[in-house]
């Protein structure tokens, strides 16, 4: 089924069935076709147009090196990715004018459901946020780890599973104000890399030596 045959609605929420606009003149894929072009996998599912699933897979194949690959650079920085770490800060008191004090209520903290009760202080609320974070970690949902702020009981230090950059807006809900402070930025990269060693070389036509760092992908 093509896009023209399916104007009335979306075939599926899967990325195989979501259209993608390829760059005109692009033949980056095997010097033959553009990123996101339809592949046999989508044809076999009945979709005949450029699509997001194909685009994601194309970009993945461009960037990911096999285990055993060696990468050399001059910075000495590992090709591994680094996850972003934030402080989450909480202030206020859990309130809902339609409920009496002590009533159960669910507060969303950056999308994570936190079970609380009306009348809770920010410090008490943080204890419930810890539970929600533990559940997210156990289910491998967005969060890699967390720990308490060393001095401020209304803050938690949170590290994410991915290595994307996340800028989260401050907002208030049910009397609690929730904000983010980035304390360690993410870094692009992937896999596990070991430093094999450094090599100092004076290249042709260069007066000063250059130090090269060799990293091997091990996982």
Swiss-Prot record:
Induction: Expressed in the late phase of the viral replicative cycle. Gene3D superfamilies: Baseplate structural protein gp11, C-terminal domain, Baseplate structural protein gp11, finger domain, Baseplate structural protein GP11, N-terminal domain. InterPro entries: Baseplate_struct_Gp11, Baseplate_struct_Gp11_C, Baseplate_struct_Gp11_N_sf, Gp11_sf, Phage_T4_Gp11_C. One of its GO terms (cellular component) is virus tail, baseplate. SUPFAM superfamilies: Baseplate structural protein gp11 (SSF56558). One of its GO terms (biological process) is viral tail assembly. It is found in: Virion. Its main location: virion. Keywords: Viral baseplate protein, Viral release from host cell, Viral tail assembly, Viral tail protein, Virion. Homotrimer. The gp11 trimer interacts with gp10 trimer and with the short tail fiber (STF) composed of the gp12 trimer. Part of the baseplate macromolecular complex which consists of gp5, gp5.4, gp27 (central spike complex); gp6, gp25, gp53 (inner baseplate); gp7, gp8 (intermediate baseplate); gp9, gp10, gp11, gp12 (peripheral); gp48 and gp54 (proximal region of the tail tube). Baseplate protein that is part of the baseplate wedge and that connects the short tail fibers to the baseplate. Involved in the tail assembly. This is Baseplate wedge protein gp11. It comes from Enterobacteria phage T4.
């Amino acid at each position: 089924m093509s896009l023209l045959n399916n104007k009335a609605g979306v075939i599926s929420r899967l990325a195989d069935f979501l259209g993608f606009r390829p760059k005109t003149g692009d033949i980056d894929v095997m010097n033959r076709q553009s990123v996101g072009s339809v592949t046999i996998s989508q044809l076999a599912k009945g979709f005949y147009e450029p699509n997001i699933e194909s685009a994601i897979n194309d970009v993945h194949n461009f960037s990911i090196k096999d285990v055993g690959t060696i990468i050399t650079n001059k910075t000495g920085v590992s090709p591994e990715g680094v996850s972003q770490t934030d402080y989450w800060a909480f202030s206020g008191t859990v309130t809902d004018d339609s409920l009496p004090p002590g009533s159960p209520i669910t507060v969303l903290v950056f999308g994570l459901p936190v079970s609380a009760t009306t009348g809770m202080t920010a410090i008490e609320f943080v204890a419930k946020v810890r539970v929600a974070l533990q559940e997210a970690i156990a289910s491998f949902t967005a969060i890699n780890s967390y720990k308490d702020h060393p001095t401020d009981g209304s803050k938690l230090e949170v590290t994410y599973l991915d290595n994307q950059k996340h800028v989260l807006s401050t907002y208030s809900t049910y009397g609690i104000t929730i904000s983010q402070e980035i304390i360690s930025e993410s870094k692009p990269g992937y896999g596990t890399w070991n430093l094999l060693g450094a090599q100092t070389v004076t290249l042709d036509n260069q007066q000063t030596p250059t130090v090269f760092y060799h990293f091997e992908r091990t996982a």
